[in-house]
Amino acid sequence: MTIKGNRMRLSSDSLSHHLSPSLADNSVVCLMAPTASGKTNLAYELYDSGRYELISVDSALVYRDMTVGTAKPNAAELARYPHHLVDIIDPMQSYSVAEFVSDVARLIDSCHQNGKIPLLVGGTMMYYMALLDGLSPVPVSDDSVRARVEQWRQDEGISALYDYLGKVDAISHERLNATDTQRITRAVEVYLQTNIPISDWQRQPKQALAHNPNQQWHALAVMPDRPWLHTRIEQRLDIMWREGLVEEVISLLERYPLTPSLPSMRCVGYRQVLEYLVQINHPVFEQSHLDKAQFYDAFAQSNLSSVESNEQDATTQSGMTQTHLSVATDQTEALACQQMQNKALYATRQLAKRQYTWLRKVMQLSDTAAEQATVSSAAPSTSIIGFDDMTASQNDKLILHSFITMEQARAYLC
């Protein structure tokens, strides 16, 4: 993803004459970095070298018609720089980590057959974890079971599924929060599909694509300065508001029978816009294909303060002229809009914080080491980690590198 309208081009000549001879033809490169850090710009330059194919590692870019809020490359960019795993499902659909891993395995083989190095670029750390650390062999959800469980959840609520989970999988029931809709739903799906609790599946040995002895994996983690990243995040969000994120969400609601519990509607930015639309009682929720009650229930607590405020002003407003009421409504909507923007900024910063935490864990960097790293002097830190303790028969190694800037990552790849 990239900040549109303000591209950060790396200071370099064409990469075509500077490709690193250390990257073998069987290499797989993961470019891991927090949101708004400039991953896409480097990916584009590497693609221009002619040696790479791009594979998106972003759980939001998989959705069609979700463009502004995901900072998705525009149509011209996607035509110039094709990405695998972008625009592959509708916002109504789900896309599991297991499905992602399966797709990536197929795409890696295809890239190598084409004489290209797969460049996996994005910020969804759960996806990277599945690729590098492994995934328990939990079966991919059956569509009919998934639809059945979703209907059950809509009819009786997540509490019914949580109670059922307590009867069939006590371990997962105790581990999961009662409001964790996504994981509870998945656990129930797995049990109904296999008759085996998901906790049993999760105890089985992990399987990771990075264990493949016929491939050389390079995992590059870029962890930029926090103040710099926070500025980039603010710039990105400003652009999203100007490009029409609110209008995009309204359009999605008009087009699809969405619910607030769908993974697509839990994406940062989209979630905050939904809450805003509920707070201002937007007429889009009157669409016949939408369950208005679900949206208002999902944001009941935040909407309550707005309702209480309106009730407190009711007596005063009863004596107002229509013009005064219109002004009051405009002020209320403006306040709700500002709250939406503040919440989206906070949520995006929290997302970046989680991404930093995971990257430090993977790179085996303590908070202190990360803070003391310098941009200008030291070479990027490197560690080579074997996975013999995870898979006794595997002797392959995963090469890990950490950087402060995209320039350092570029230097490694050039």
UniProtKB/Swiss-Prot annotation:
Its cofactor is Mg(2+). InterPro entries: Dimethylallyltransferase, IPT, P-loop_NTPase. Substrate binds at residues 35-40. Pfam families: IPPT (PF01715). ATP binds at residues 33-40. Its EC number is 2.5.1.75. One of its GO terms (biological process) is tRNA modification. Residues 58-61, 182-186, 266-271 are annotated as: Interaction with substrate tRNA. Belongs to the IPP transferase family. Monomer. Catalyzes the transfer of a dimethylallyl group onto the adenine at position 37 in tRNAs that read codons beginning with uridine, leading to the formation of N6-(dimethylallyl)adenosine (i(6)A). This is tRNA dimethylallyltransferase.
